[in-house]
Amino acid sequence: MKNTTEEKREAIPNSVSRMLLAGIGVLLQVLWIFWLALKLNDYSTAIQVCTSVLTFLITLRIYGLHINSAYKISWIILILLFPIFGLTIYLLFGRSGAVSVMRRRFGRNMTMLRQYHVPILQQRRALPYPDRITRNHARYLQDRAGYPAYDNTDVTFYGDTCEALEAQKTALRSAEKFIFMEYHAIEDASAWQELEDILAERAAHGVEVRVFYDDVGSIGFINSKFVKKLAGRGIQCRRFNPVIPILNVFMNNRDHRKITVVDGRVGFTGGYNLAEEYFNRTHPYGQWKDSGIRLEGDAVRGLTLIFLELWGATQKAAPEVERYLPDVPYTAQENAVVLPYADNPLDDEATGENVYLNMIRSAKDYVYITTPYLILSDEMQRTLRLAASSGVDVRIITPGIPDKKLIFSVTRSYYASLAKSGVRIYEYAPGFIHAKQCVADGTEAVVGTINFDFRSLYLHFENACWFCGCSAVADVRRDFDALFPVCREVTQEYADTRSLAVRGWDCVLRLFSPLM
């Protein structure tokens, strides 16, 4: 592991101005609403009564929602302590969902795309699962989330994102029909430029190229002319949920997915975005650690359909689907079962969290986890503690150098209760670990975009891939084995009794952590 130093990242000036304009616009509107509510509250007893009634009704509504209890409690306490401020913030940012147009389009897309999952769901009941446990885990994703499992697929794991990037470039150069790319963050710098040049060359040869990025995730990396620049090179490009200086409930729900699909035969996903730091070309937080996977074979169909979920939701007409689901002849080298899946904030199914919970609950020997942020629900905490208390080797790796110091403090506030139950906590000493991966008992693994925090599990559009019965599972385990020696284990430090002040501060952080 080479030594690196922290470097400041320079933001794109145009992006900074957009971010400031949007932030100032939203802040002014929030302050105006807050000021108006205070004035009205002082002006009339009737207004005070209405505020109290509204506070009571909203509190009841939150309590009755089918969402995580910690999330509900945090909002209820905020509203009861600061009624006007709490109500304003909750009505603006506290509800998972979308404006009616986006919700309608997304629902239309999901209904239509499910039709393409159904034949696979019906055909793939007798796949070569290693055991009953993995079969049941796949069954959950198929029966509840609606995403089918596939065989005839080879999985390649990359613990080094530079290797993943090179494999991605090789696949892109071979494209003959279409390329789909969806990422939370794209930085218009050297790594992206290498990809863009390949995309433009393929587009010039008649390949349909689509690029889709989240506007908030990319706002510090690219300027407002990025979409036009790509269009000038023959590349279709769209922004998800553009930043505007107007209050919008849906602004809280971001596209955190990372997907590349080439001709429906090769696909990539994982934790890394297409920005310099993800490939250690810059070092804003020391050495960057991330991971990803390459799929080749039938399961790429699943990634294609996941891409079309949000791409189609940004247009009025229903997206064309069948032409992007070619029957590609392929014979896999291993008997893997591969299941690409996604999660979204517009339903009541916490798919991403439930996959993790299933793996932890059924682990017999070990379960290893990496996550950049550790903000856990009560259920997740109990599950991790119970597994460790039952003799399972539970280990979690978090960053050694944080990208967000407040969130890092929140992450550390969860260490003590976990460590006292036997969960082993490690911090990645060389820098920032951004990988989102989990492996259990050497039989199954997940690699994707889903962090162990509330935003990933409840508010964002996410995707991941669960797989078993292939050498990639062992490769994920080997990646963990290489990580532990360069990490600093802090288990005992947090298992020991700490001062009352520290414990009190941790309680405050955890109380409002679901809102971060």
Regions found by a protein language model. Give the residues of each.
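Catalytic-core elements of nucleic-acid end-processing and repair enzymes
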Residues: K436
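Helical hairpin unit composed of two closely spaced alpha helices linked by a short loop
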Residues: A363, Y373-R395, P399, K404
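N-terminal localization/anchoring segments of enzymes in phospholipid and broader phosphate metabolism
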Residues: M1-N354, N358, S362, P402, ...
